[in-house]
């Protein structure tokens, strides 16, 4: 029985200590934060429109995301914040193969591509709500994006003649807009665990893409234009420094 009493007393003491810590943390008023987080990048539909005269068969697949964000609360609920997000997504080239197979299904076509590299620098207002050790945020932001289109290559045999089409890697920049929601849980006086989801939409225009066509021993280059409406949903988790 002595061991049971000792265990019960120990559990009660631990529970009281945990409750006391939560009470203290919930009454500390933090006005600012700095987040460092990482997670997944999911390509989603963009609210930007494409250009029918400059289509593309290259898409982005699921990838990784990293974000640094900082904010400061100006009033009880409202504040301003900024973020820098970088997303890396492998290129999806299956549509290139599907389109050429419609006219030449026996060519043994294959396609490969590099990685989309998208960086977003955004700023805007945010609203926050506190509930004990929990903090909930919602934000609307705008800013600038830098998009790197990956290099791609399509190759096969066009009526028994070797054919390849290589398109070079290139960069573009454009205005962007988005928003997000987040939740933070205080674990010490200065740190919290953070989980957030952010959407960014932009439209990247590539005016000077170089496409190299090789048929047998013959080779030629062509300048082309592509417009990519880009939508990205980043779901990240990490650590938040509170001040």
Language model region names:
Residues 133-137, 149-151:
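Short, structured loop/turn "capping" segments at alpha-beta junctions
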Residues 43-61, 85-120, 145-174, 202-236:
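Extracellular/periplasm-exposed beta-strand and loop segments of Gram-negative cell-envelope proteins
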Residues 1-30:
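Cleavable N-terminal export/targeting peptides
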Residues 20-73, 79, 232-243:
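Short glycine/proline- and aromatic-enriched beta-strand/turn motifs that initiate or cap beta-hairpins
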Residues 185-194, 203-209:
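Substrate-binding/catalytic groove segments of enzymes
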Residues 32, 64, 78, 119-121, ...:
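Hydrophobic core residues within well-ordered beta-strands of beta-rich domains
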Residues 77-82, 133-135, 190-193:
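Repeated loop/turn-to-beta-strand initiation elements of outer-membrane beta-barrel proteins
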Residues 36-40, 68-72, 84-86, 123-129, ...:
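Residues on the lipid-exposed face of transmembrane beta-strands in outer-membrane beta-barrel proteins
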């Amino acid at each position: 029985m002595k061991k049971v009493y000792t265990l019960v007393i120990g559990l009660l003491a631990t529970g009281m200590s945990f409750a006391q810590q939560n009470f203290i943390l919930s009454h500390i008023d933090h006005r600012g934060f700095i987040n460092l987080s990482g997670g997944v990048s999911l390509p989603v539909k963009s609210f930007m429109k494409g250009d029918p005269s400059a289509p593309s068969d290259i898409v982005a697949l699921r990838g990784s995301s990293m974000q640094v964000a900082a904010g400061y609360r100006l009033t009880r609920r409202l504040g301003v914040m900024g973020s820098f997000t970088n997303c890396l997504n492998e290129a999806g080239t299956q549509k290139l193969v599907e389109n050429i197979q419609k006219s030449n299904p026996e060519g043994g076509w294959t396609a490969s591509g590099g990685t989309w590299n998208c960086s977003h620098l955004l700023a805007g207002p945010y609203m926050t709500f506190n509930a004990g050790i929990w903090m909930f945020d919602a934000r609307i932001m705008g800013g600038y994006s830098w998009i790197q289109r990956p290099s791609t290559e399509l190759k096969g045999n066009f009526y028994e003649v070797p054919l390849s089409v290589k398109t070079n890697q290139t960069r573009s920049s454009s205005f962007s807009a988005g928003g997000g929601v987040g939740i933070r849980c205080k674990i010490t006086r200065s740190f919290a665990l953070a989980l957030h989801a952010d959407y960014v939409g932009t439209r990247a225009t590539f005016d000077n893409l170089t496409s190299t066509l090789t048929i047998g021993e013959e080779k030629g280059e062509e300048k082309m234009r592509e417009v990519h409406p880009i939508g990205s949903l980043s779901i990240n988790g990490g650590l938040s420094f509170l001040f």
